[in-house]
Structure formats: C-alpha cells, structure tokens
A protein has these predicted regions:
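Carboxylate- and glycine-rich phosphate/diphosphate-binding segment that chelates Mg2+/Mn2+
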Residues: 72-182
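Short, intrinsically disordered, charge-balanced linker/junction segments flanking boundaries
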Residues: 1-6, 239-243
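Glycine/threonine-rich beta-strand-loop-alpha-helix active-site module
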Residues: 2-7, 11-100
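Glycine-rich phosphate/pyrophosphate-binding beta-alpha loops
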Residues: 64, 174-203
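Gly/Pro-rich interdomain helix-loop hinge
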Residues: 197-243
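Buried hydrophobic packing segments
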Residues: 28-33, 122-123, 143-149, 172-176, ...
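Short, well-ordered alpha-helices that flank and scaffold nucleotide-derived cofactor binding pockets
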Residues: 7, 34, 38, 181, ...
C-alpha cells in the first residue's frame, strides 16, 4: 500500500507533509517526507539513499505511539510476515502538535491498546542498557501518569478517560522521548512477528509478552533496574513489591 502511495504522489509538487492519525498513519507520513522512495522494503533494508526534502508536521490522534518525538518508523512487510523498523534522524518531525480533543473519539479498546503501548515504551526505555538519567526522568513520569490514570478510570468509569486524555497524551509523549533515545527491548522485538503475520494490534501484541519478559529479567538480573521499576509500580498501585 505504501509503495502505491509513493507512485501516486511521484509527480505531485509539494513541500510539506502533515500527518494526522494513529501510529501507522504517522509512520507512513514520515516516509512521505523523504525524497525519491521507490520501494518501502528496500528503504527499510537501507538499500536506498535516505534524503529528507519536505517539512514534516505530526499530530497524533492516539495516546500510544510517541511518534511526534521519535526518529522511528515501523511498517509491516507482508512478504516476510513481520514488521521492520527504520530509525534515522531524517524521520524526526519539524513540529509535533498534541491536541487531546482529537483522541477523544477513540473507541475504548483502541485507547487501552494505545496507552498500554505507551506504558511499555516507558518501561522498556527505562530498563534499556542505553538509558540515561535524562531518559529515566521521562520514563518514570510516563509510567506514573499512565498507571495513576488507569486507577482514576477504574474508579470513575471508562468514559472518564476523556476527562484526563491530556494526561495520557502527554505521558505518551514522555514515553516517546524515553524510548526514542534509549530504545526498546525484547517485548517489542517479540511482538513484531505477532503483529506482522497475525495482524494483532501493536499494543496488544506487546502486552502478550510483557510479563514473561519482565519475569525473565527479574530471574536473570534481579539486582538490576527491575528493582527500581518494581518499587515505582508498587507505590503507584499500592501493592506489595513481592506481588
């Protein structure tokens, strides 16, 4: 589909891309700001020159991707039954605009999956060996905002999410800063084939592997940053750390 879009716009003269939508739309928008892309697959396999020649403005309508502050694009490659990622500075947006009202039309299920994606972005960004004190600040705050937001929704009902949508959208942005600099880990790596082959929504695919990966980390490096993460989550949800 992306290759067909490139064919359609090949002879159109434009100098700005405004991408408004969820993660997939934003990731495609980033690619449309590049010059002379003939094959998405070749682009993602670094077989084509990557040249940015258009202004890029990103406006997310979900609270999960953080794409407005990352240099990452993820696409499904059907011929290989998986997803591939491209991370280059040419994919950074010139401007990112956060408008909570645009997220309020999301169905509840889409909200859950997208916000879980942001939560996992922040968790993996924090646990990444490439994390820094800077990225940890954003990761910790994102985790706190998302989990405390979930608690409010549990207490006041699912429609209450729209009252605090700005909280989730900013948390997604913070998570984007965290993982955009520190990277993600095994949860995302394992989820790509699940999404690429079976079309499982990205947030749901990540969720399927989250606890198994965290338990593996705890078993193999129980004295690492997993302890700090456990303490943070326990303090937010008022649970004992051993739970």
């Amino acid at each position: 589909i992306i290759d067909e879009i490139f064919k359609d716009i090949k002879n159109i003269d434009f100098n700005r891309v405004i991408a408004i939508g969820g993660g997939s739309i934003l990731d495609v928008g980033k690619l449309l700001a590049l010059k002379d892309v003939s094959s998405t697959k070749k682009l993602f396999k670094r077989e084509l020159p990557i040249i940015r020649d258009k202004e890029l403005i990103i406006v997310p309508t979900t609270c999960g991707t953080g794409s407005e502050v990352t240099n990452i694009s993820i696409v499904e490659i059907k011929s290989e039954n998986t997803k591939l990622g491209l991370a280059v500075d040419e994919l950074y947006a010139d401007k990112g605009v956060l408008i909570p009202e645009l997220c309020k039309t999301m169905p509840y299920k889409a909200f859950v999956y997208s916000s879980i994606d942001a939560l996992i972005h922040s968790i993996e960004g924090f646990l990444s060996p490439n994390s820094t004190q800077y990225t940890d600040l954003f990761a910790f705050k994102a985790i706190e905002m998302i989990l405390s937001g979930y608690k409010e929704i549990l207490e006041k009902g699912e429609e209450y999410r729209n009252t605090i949508m700005d909280k989730f959208l900013i948390a997604s942005n913070y998570a984007g800063i965290a993982f955009g600099n520190a990277g993600v880990g095994a949860v995302h790596a394992l989820s790509y084939p699940l999404g690429g082959k079976y079309h499982v929504p990205h947030g749901e695919a990540n969720y399927q592997f989250l606890m198994a990966v965290l338990n593996f980390y705890k078993k193999n490096n129980g004295d690492g940053k997993i302890i700090e993460l456990t303490k943070l989550i326990s303090s937010i949800i008022n649970a004992k750390e051993e739970d």
